[in-house]
Each structure stands twice: as structure tokens, then as C-alpha cells.
Amino acid sequence: MRFLAIALLLVALAGCSKPAEPTNNQVVATPEVGPHKGIDRSHKGAPAPDTTFKNPDGGDISLAKFHGVPVLVNLWATWCAPCVKELPTLDKLAQSHDVDGALGIIAVNQEDKPNTAVDAFLKTTIKARSLGAYQDPNMALMGKLGPDAVLPTTFLYDANGKEVWRYVGDLDWTSPEAARLLSEAGSPVPAPKG
């Protein structure tokens, strides 16, 4: 009996070792801690994907629009607890760059929801003042990440549209760690004030 209990426990734990592979309409949220959370520089120098997604006005946009300035791209969803946890700090970072323009910051929702619903979520739940309701309802950006894609994932692209790093999981974007990571954009990116 004890052997059976141990065997069942091992099978259950093995199922938890890797997130499920997303389908076209499924994305996995990252664990709060674990092997999938942290900085990934293995794609350094890769060009930004040329896929299109929706800007806050509902029009098509691509990351090429941000060429000439480093850009931080956060992929998130309303149902993703780590995403919701980090969005207020990402908004605070975005507020600090509204004036200086040293860093473009966009949060791209990965759900097939009306733009008005995503915008309302950002304004009422997150209390966002600077993050616009960018959307990728077809999850084209997530699709570029491969079968192990999880939310949130945040990318830093340099002014030439080349990936510097990606951060898997939530991060306090107002922290000294985030400021250090953002400084890798190729030009000084000041930490948010306050």
C-alpha cells in the first residue's frame, strides 16, 4: 500500500514539472517561483517578430513602429495572477517614460476580448494611467515563443529591434533589479521616480 501511495505521488509530481503546452487558444501562467521564472538571454540578437497585433484604437500595429527606441513588450492576460500582480509596477514604469520617451512600454493582452473590456480592466482593476489596451487576440506574439510559452513574459528589444532578453514571470518593474535589466537596452533608461 505504501509503495502504491509513493508511486501515485511521483506520477502526480511528474505532471507538475512542466506547464501544459498551449494550443491556439490556451496559454499557461507561470508559477510564482520555479524553473520557468527569470531572465532568459538565449535569444539575444534575434529580430523582433514582424507579426501584427491591435493598438489601443483597434488598428493594426507591429513592433516595427517602435524602431529607433528601445521597447519593453509585456504579454499578459486578465486571468493570469502573476500578470495582474506586476501590471501596476509596469504602469508606474510607463508613467516615468511618458515624458522622456527613452523607452517604449507596451502591455499586449493575449485574450480574444473586446478592446473596451481590456481597457476597462486596465483602468479599473489595475488603475493604469499609462498602459494602453494593446491586444493580440490570435496570440501571434505568443506563437513566436514556441510550445513552452507562459504568461507573463516580457521582452526588451533594443532601438534596432533586436532582442536583448526576455523575462519569464512577474517582476516588480520599479525595483533596482528591473532598472539594472532595463539599462541593458543600449542607452540609459532611468528608474521610475517615487
Residues of each region from the PLM?
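Structural microenvironment flanking redox-active thiols in thiol-disulfide oxidoreductases
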Residues: 85-126, 138-144, 194
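Conserved redox-active cysteine motifs that mediate thiol-disulfide chemistry
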Residues: 67, 75-92
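N-terminal targeting signals for export/organelle localization
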Residues: 1-50, 189-194
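Thiol/disulfide oxidoreductase modules built on the thioredoxin-like
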Residues: 123-130, 135-184
